């Protein structure tokens, strides 16, 4: 016998958990819609689109036993700060950022990054994967122990980080507040096995918990009972953008060795926004140098802003961000970079927009200062705003399922040009990172990857690329793929010129289960503006997921 259940009121807007997966959710617009035919993607009144119930559905829903559901996954965005002890009494303040998903009540897995924020090592940045065990002490307190395995380096990275492998273990406790997130503290130990950094220090951290709706594997929509009324699920507004920037430096800007800074630098990267309400948003962005004389420069900025509608399809956006930045000889001091600016966004279709931004960036502790001109291609979409309560498939009729895939990847570079690097020219370079794929059809996918060197005497080398791939099944278990990518790379003594790189890969994959696959890859990467040319051999572990976006 069924019983009516009254749903709780909608909770606060959850931050978008697809900071990594959203890099693949875009396509070029086909046409520009006329003003009188245009429906603004965030709603005609410039508010985030919400899934509305009809008048007949305005009462709490009734469930039956056969109603299939999806259990949302508890997820956390975590920020950590600690100060590492370097040789000769030097200190390096590091800011960490992690995205963690609960596998069960005791285990969390995710991806993360650490970047220098204070000291004299601006641009020292690492990327990697994170695992954490946790045990509840009481209703408000948790104990935890974690391990981060990553790769990277930066200013002085060759000496400090060696090949680039970073290991970080930590133990601590966390206090869970009901309304303001979680506060934690503990002790961590950081080691670069092939470098000279070995440091134990206290840390503090802040966590923002929320829930995301993902299904393991590529789930098919089950058969649904049309008599079951829909849950009042809402869609939260989000944006993802491909970004191109030009920095025009001030006359007083210098390089970190005291020599004059070149007049400009070009960057490429990605940006993700999540709206807290109809006007305010938070955002994170990451870019790397691909032109100029600062190859190896990278920035990861976090902040927020305000969107002011001008017409139904035009908006003015204001933002302010801060985060770690540096490398490539840029004089960012300890690494803290501040950025503020204005943007004019023009929608060209229901989901696509172009944005022109103008701003200023500065490193408060040193001479790095520039005007920033940016061009962005935005993709706008809605995600289910859910709590910890199981969600009925019947509630998702106004959402499309999206096929997603995350790959934990190892790629090794082998010399294809005698001048491909400035030291250890006969030694291969091994890289660790994450690749994310968004399937736009059964045979085509958008892809993005972020990799950093962990072995091969190339500590501080990093690359971030986006591109297009194709997938074809050979049998039920075997498949082949091809992909082409372009992006930015630098550091570690690899001769990438201004930083622009292009890569092509071919892969053979085997399905271990409905969700898990293993892939072997062969490819080629080169820098059009430099002597860097390398053959690529890789292996990756791929996990398939189903996500949901508003129709």
Where are these regions (language model features)?
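N-terminal signal peptide c-region/cleavage motif recognized by signal peptidases
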Residues: 27-29
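Outer-membrane beta-barrel "beta-signal"
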Residues: 38-40, 198-225, 239-249, 369-393, ...
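Transmembrane beta-strand segments of Gram-negative outer membrane beta-barrel proteins
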Residues: 65-83, 107-109, 143-147, 230-250, ...
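Repeated loop/turn-to-beta-strand initiation elements of outer-membrane beta-barrel proteins
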Residues: 75, 105-111, 139-143, 175-185, ...
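Hydrophobic, lipid-facing positions within transmembrane beta-strands of outer-membrane proteins
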Residues: 75-77, 93-97, 113, 125-131, ...
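Transmembrane beta-strands of outer-membrane beta-barrel pores
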Residues: 81-87, 113-119, 149-155, 187-193, ...
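Solvent-exposed loop/turn segments connecting transmembrane beta-strands
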Residues: 84-95, 116-127, 137, 155-165, ...
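Gram-negative (and chloroplast) outer-membrane scaffold detector with strong preference
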Residues: 98-157, 271-330, 433-501, 548
């Amino acid at each position: 016998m069924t019983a009516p259940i009254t749903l709780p009121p909608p909770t606060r807007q959850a931050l978008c958990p697809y900071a990594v997966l959203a890099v693949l959710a875009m396509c070029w617009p086909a046409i520009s819609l006329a003003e009188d035919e245009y429906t603004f993607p965030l709603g005609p009144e410039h508010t985030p689109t919400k899934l509305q119930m009809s008048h007949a559905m305005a009462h709490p829903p009734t469930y039956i036993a056969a109603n299939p559901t999806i259990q949302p996954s508890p997820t956390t965005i975590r920020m950590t700060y600690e100060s590492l002890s370097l040789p000769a009494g030097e200190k390096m303040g590091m800011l960490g950022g992690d995205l963690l998903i609960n596998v069960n009540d005791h285990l969390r897995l995710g991806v993360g990054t650490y970047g220098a924020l204070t000291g004299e090592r601006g641009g020292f940045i690492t990327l990697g994967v994170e695992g954490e065990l946790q045990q509840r002490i009481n209703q408000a307190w948790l104990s935890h122990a974690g391990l981060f395995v990553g790769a990277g380096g930066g200013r002085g990275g060759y000496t400090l980080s060696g090949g680039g492998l970073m290991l970080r273990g930590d133990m601590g406790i966390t206090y869970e507040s009901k309304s303001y997130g979680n506060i934690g503290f503990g002790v961590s130990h950081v080691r670069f096995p092939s470098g000279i950094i070995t440091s134990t220090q206290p840390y503090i951290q802040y966590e923002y918990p929320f829930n995301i709706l993902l299904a393991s594997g590529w789930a098919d929509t089950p058969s649904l009972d049309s008599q079951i009324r829909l849950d009042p699920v809402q869609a939260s507004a989000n944006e993802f953008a491909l970004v191109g920037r030009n920095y025009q430096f001030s006359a007083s800007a210098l390089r970190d060795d005291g020599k004059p800074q070149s007049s400009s630098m070009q960057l490429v990267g990605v940006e993700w926004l999540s709206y807290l309400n109809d006007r305010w948003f938070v955002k994170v962005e990451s870019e790397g140098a691909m032109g100029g004389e600062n190859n190896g420069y990278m920035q990861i900025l976090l902040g927020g802003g305000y969107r002011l509608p001008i017409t139904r399809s035009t908006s003015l956006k204001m933002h302010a961000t801060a985060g770690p930045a540096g490398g490539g000889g840029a004089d960012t001091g300890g690494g803290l970079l501040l950025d503020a600016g204005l943007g004019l966004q023009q929608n060209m279709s229901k989901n696509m927009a172009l944005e022109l931004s103008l701003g200023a960036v500065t490193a408060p502790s040193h001479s790095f200062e520039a005007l920033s001109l940016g061009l962005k291609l935005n993709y706008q979409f809605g995600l289910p705003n859910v709590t910890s309560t199981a969600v009925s498939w019947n509630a998702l009729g106004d959402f499309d399922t999206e096929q997603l895939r995350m790959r934990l990847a190892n790629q090794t570079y082998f010399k294809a040009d005698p001048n491909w690097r400035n030291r250890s020219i006969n030694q291969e370079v091994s890289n660790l990172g994450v690749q994310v794929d968004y399937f736009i059809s059964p045979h085509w996918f958008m892809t993005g990857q972020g990799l950093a060197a962990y072995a091969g005497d190339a500590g501080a080398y990093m690359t971030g690329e986006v591109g297009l791939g194709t997938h074809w099944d050979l049998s039920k278990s075997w498949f082949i793929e091809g992909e082409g990518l372009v992006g930015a790379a630098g550091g570690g003594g690899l001769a990438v010129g201004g930083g622009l790189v292009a890569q092509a890969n071919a892969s053979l994959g085997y399905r271990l289960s409905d969700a898990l696959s293993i892939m072997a890859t062969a490819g080629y990467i080169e820098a059009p503006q430099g002597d860097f040319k390398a053959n690529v051999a890789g292996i990756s572990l791929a996990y398939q997921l189903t996500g949901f976006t508003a129709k």
